[in-house]
């Protein structure tokens, strides 16, 4: 997690190449975020819910509210995430920012035909808080 290329400086074999590949950069992106106290980073490429943490930085993959596949078995990106909190796709994030704490809620999306007593549109499937960085 956050170890490769401009994010962490290593190539796919784990060899440090940052200085060769990014000669004008002082530090990889992850090291910059850790150094300057970034507490959370939101990323939205894979369209699933995964929360990971490294060196005090929370990496939050953002879900897709229109994903019609609710179960883990249909999620083709699951194997790319070796650690962290994973939840099945289809939902959105509600982020509440305050002066001393930020709360992130994962709100599930369900088509009306797929709702059950256990799974309702708008249910909070996962929550966590993050304190401000330094």
Predicted feature residues:
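Long, structured stretches of catalytic cores involved in phosphate-ester chemistry, encompassing
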Residues: 1-114
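C-terminal/domain-terminus segments
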Residues: 107-133
């Amino acid at each position: 997690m956050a170890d490769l290329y401009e994010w962490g400086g290593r190539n796919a074999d784990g060899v440090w190449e940052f200085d060769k590949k990014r000669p004008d950069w002082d530090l990889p992106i992850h090291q910059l975020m850790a150094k300057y106290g970034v507490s959370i980073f939101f990323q939205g490429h894979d369209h699933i819910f995964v929360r990971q943490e490294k060196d005090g930085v929370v990496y939050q993959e953002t879900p897709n509210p229109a994903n019609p596949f609710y179960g883990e078995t249909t999620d083709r990106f699951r194997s790319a995430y070796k650690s962290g909190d994973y939840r099945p796709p289809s939902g959105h994030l509600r982020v509440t920012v305050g002066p001393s704490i930020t709360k992130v809620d994962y709100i599930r999306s369900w088509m009306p035909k797929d709702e059950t007593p256990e799974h309702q549109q708008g249910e909070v499937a996962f929550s966590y808080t993050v304190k401000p960085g330094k």
